[in-house]
Swiss-Prot record:
<dbReference type="GO" id="GO:0046740">
    <property type="term" value="P:transport of virus in host, cell to cell"/>
</dbReference>
<comment type="similarity">
    <text>Belongs to the Tymovirales TGBp3 protein family.</text>
</comment>
<keyword id="KW-1133">Transmembrane helix</keyword>
<protein>
    <recommendedName>
        <fullName>Movement protein TGBp3</fullName>
    </recommendedName>
</protein>
<keyword id="KW-0472">Membrane</keyword>
<keyword id="KW-0812">Transmembrane</keyword>
<keyword id="KW-0813">Transport</keyword>
<dbReference type="InterPro" id="IPR003411">
    <property type="entry name" value="TGBp3"/>
</dbReference>
<keyword id="KW-0916">Viral movement protein</keyword>
<feature type="topological domain" description="Lumenal">
    <location>
        <begin position="1"/>
        <end position="4"/>
    </location>
</feature>
<keyword id="KW-1043">Host membrane</keyword>
<dbReference type="Pfam" id="PF02495">
    <property type="entry name" value="TGBp3"/>
</dbReference>
<feature type="topological domain" description="Cytoplasmic">
    <location>
        <begin position="28"/>
        <end position="64"/>
    </location>
</feature>
<comment type="function">
    <text>Plays a role in viral cell-to-cell propagation, by facilitating genome transport to neighboring plant cells through plasmosdesmata. May induce the formation of granular vesicles derived from the Endoplasmic reticulum, which align on actin filaments.</text>
</comment>
<dbReference type="GO" id="GO:0044167">
    <property type="term" value="C:host cell endoplasmic reticulum membrane"/>
</dbReference>
<keyword id="KW-1038">Host endoplasmic reticulum</keyword>
<dbReference type="GO" id="GO:0016020">
    <property type="term" value="C:membrane"/>
</dbReference>
Length: 64
């Protein structure tokens, strides 16, 4: 019973370690921020089709 618990803990710890290492070595994060004044795109690899689609986006408008 104890060896099963230790094995499970080792598997979980290994998964967390690998997951964190993947995040460190692949920091490419694509962020799209839409506000009431602008649209900002950071860290994205964009194709011409993406540029055409993004050109039709509008700023966020909320009518209260």
């Amino acid at each position: 019973m104890r060896s099963v618990a230790l094995t499970l803990c080792a598997i979980i710890a290994g998964y967390l370690l690998v997951s964190n290492l993947q995040n460190v070595f692949s920091p490419e994060v694509c962020t799209l921020v839409i506000t009431g004044e602008s649209i900002r795109i950071n860290g994205c690899n964009l194709s011409p089709a993406h540029f055409r689609a993004i050109s039709h986006l509008k700023v966020l408008q909320i009518h209260l």
